[in-house]
């Protein structure tokens, strides 16, 4: 029984998604339906959490919009998510960056991870 479920879930999972981690700045292209037409909307921010559960995987992106913090959780394999692009890699030592919610300005910055030689 579980093999059937696993096979169905693997069939629905997206392939070709980039590797990203908490602290990375990503641009998520989201399909937005307005009336009868569909368009793409970009949501750029810092990944503050990732939940790895196979088909039910999700990640949370935080950005500052007009001085107000905005967080949005995306299902990784959702048909609403069109593409994910990693803009920069962040060097962090935590899996969940919820402490960024209380910070603003320079204290909310994340150092950039330098490429290994």
From Swiss-Prot:
Coiled-coil residue spans: none
Disulfide bonds: none
Source organism superkingdom: Bacteria
Function, in words: This protein is located at the 30S-50S ribosomal subunit interface and may play a role in the structure and function of the aminoacyl-tRNA binding site.
Name of this chain's protein: Large ribosomal subunit protein bL19
Keywords: Ribonucleoprotein, Ribosomal protein
NCBIfam families hit by this protein: rplS_bact (TIGR01024)
Gene designation per UniProt: rplS
Similarity comment: Belongs to the bacterial ribosomal protein bL19 family.
Gene Ontology MF terms: structural constituent of ribosome
HAMAP family: Ribosomal_bL19
GO-annotated biological processes: translation
GO CC entries: cytosolic large ribosomal subunit
Pfam families in the record: Ribosomal_L19 (PF01245)
Keyword Ribosomal protein recorded: yes
């Amino acid at each position: 029984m579980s093999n059937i479920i696993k096979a169905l879930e693997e069939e629905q999972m997206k392939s070709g998604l980039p590797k990203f981690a908490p602290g990375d700045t990503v641009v998520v292209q989201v399909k937005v339906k307005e009336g009868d037409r569909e368009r793409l909307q970009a949501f750029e921010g810092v990944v503050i959490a990732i939940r790895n559960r196979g088909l039910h995987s999700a990640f949370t992106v935080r950005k500052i919009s007009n001085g107000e913090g905005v967080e949005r959780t995306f299902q990784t394999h959702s048909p609403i998510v069109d593409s994910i692009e990693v803009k920069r890699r962040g060097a962090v030592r935590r899996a969940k960056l919820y402490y960024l919610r209380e910070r603003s300005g320079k204290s909310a910055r994340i150092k950039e991870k330098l490429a290994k030689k």
